[in-house]
Amino acid sequence: MGLFDFLFGKKKENTTVVFGVEERLPNPNNLEDLVVIGLVRGTIHVGDEVIITNLGSDNDKPAKAVISALEDANKAQVKKASGDNVVVTIKDGKKHNVYKGTVLHSEGVSEDKLRASYLYAILNAFFSGKVGY
């Protein structure tokens, strides 16, 4: 953000993203990829590299993965998604230990946001009574 932007109020776009996994499914088109469903906070793009964190596990180390596809609630393929329930395809996601409650996020996300996303995903996955998105 330069001086000109500062003086005239142009704000830098928030680049952080947090996504709690509420459901996981195999990808029928590519068995190595993994499809997950959940609520995205921030903006996620196809091609983004995200960190996979399992807050409920003492053994899993954070891992990095790439988002290969996004689908909105209307089942339309999109290039980016923000603040909505979405279907995310994780490239080579099968090799990562992803389950309900796993959090996908960008660098620099606070511990509070990670925990809030984890709790939201767990509550929706096990207590909301909804299936899918």
Stretches with model-predicted labels:
Residues 11-41, 49-133:
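Beta-strand/loop-dominated core regions that host nucleotide or nucleotide-derived cofactor-binding catalytic loops
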